[in-house]
Amino acid sequence: MDLRQQRKRDHVRLAAAWQERRPPPAAAGPGAGWEDVHLVNHSLPELALAEIDLTTSVAGVRLAQPVVINAMTGGADDVTAINRDLAAVAADLGLAMAVGSQTAGLRDPAVADSYRVVRRVNPKGIVLANVGSDATPEQARAAVEMVEADLLQIHLNAPQELRMPEGDRDFRGRLEAIARMVEEAPVPVVVKECGFGVSRDVAVLLHQAGVRAVDVSGRGGTNFAWIEDRRAGLSDPDPGLQNWGIPTACALAEVAALGLPELDLIASGGIRHGSDAAKALALGARAAAVAGPVLLRQQREGARGVMAYLQQFLTDLRAAMLLAGAGSVAAMGQVPVVVTGFTGEWCRLRGVDLMALANRSER
């Protein structure tokens, strides 16, 4: 059996298993930080739930909803059904969707349909292609063409690669490779971490390279270090490496505080509910992305389960926005937000002005 295809199957199986671990094991470490982020109740919102405007944009591409079905899978025949189900739900709800890493499809045309199915099922939706940071401009263009993508997602995942027995060990030249893809890609580029968090320093480098959007993808969601340790059969994995990364709320807050012009932020990692997404919008994200909870429901209940979950997610997002007094995604970025606990301490030490966040007002 092809090693890459088997790895795809392993990732789906173990990602679903991770989501089912409630409460999470001690090795899971701290969460994404959303429990430390508090929206201030607005008792006189003067808003109607049906009129909450969820439209937003990322890198100049308009999104009907500020929620993205994030990259999960592709590259093996038996995961095609997963992408088919997710694409059908994305089409019905008007959600953008990213495919999983297309390296397998670029190397083996026989599995390319596991990605192409997304565009076939959702011909008018927003689709994100997906390549690694070591891809060439030619590979990036081919990935975009494969799914007729509107955006190109470039993923960063050094901690996962180092835990993977067959993973990369040399990460030199990645920023230069990203800059070349940005220059030559036919669509805007979104750079995405894979659950380990983008720091403000890396965000500056990506911005200087011309990247238009960053998915901070912090710790607190699916733990790919844990997944790779399970795949490798480690009996005593290093907890410091298995729990490596910046919690999502911390990463988002410190990157948003930079105020980098023309750099849109997406938040992912531990976003399980609509209120989590609302908190992400308040901290500066233009959209929130979800993967693990969606995959778990697809594995358990198929497209119907995914549809029910995401419908409730959007309903709860609208409710949280109304209760915070925000009638739009832009307005949500101006409501007061109080950050406490570990997340607050991280932000304070990293120079985020928490007093300004807590005392601002959209009105």
UniProtKB/Swiss-Prot annotation:
Chief localization: cytoplasm
Gene Ontology annotations of biological process type: isoprenoid biosynthetic process
Primary enzyme class: isomerase
Cysteine disulfide links: none
GO molecular function per UniProt: FMN binding; isopentenyl-diphosphate delta-isomerase activity; magnesium ion binding; NADPH binding; oxidoreductase activity
Domain of life: Bacteria
Residues annotated to bind Mg(2+): E161
Binding site for FMN: A71, M72, T73, S101, N130, K192, S217, T222, G270, I271, R272, A291, G292
Co-factor requirement: FMN; NADPH; Mg(2+)
EC number: 5.3.3.2
Any Pfam family matching the protein: FMN_dh
Catalytic reaction equation(s): isopentenyl diphosphate = dimethylallyl diphosphate
Keyword Nucleotidyltransferase listed: no
Binding site for substrate: R7, K8, Q160
Entry's Gene Ontology cellular component terms: cytoplasm
Places the protein is found: Cytoplasm
NCBIfam families, A to Z: IPP_isom_2
Annotated function: Involved in the biosynthesis of isoprenoids. Catalyzes the 1,3-allylic rearrangement of the homoallylic substrate isopentenyl (IPP) to its allylic isomer, dimethylallyl diphosphate (DMAPP).
Quaternary state and interactors: Homooctamer. Dimer of tetramers.
Family as reported in the entry's similarity comment: Belongs to the IPP isomerase type 2 family.
Name recorded for this polypeptide: Isopentenyl-diphosphate delta-isomerase
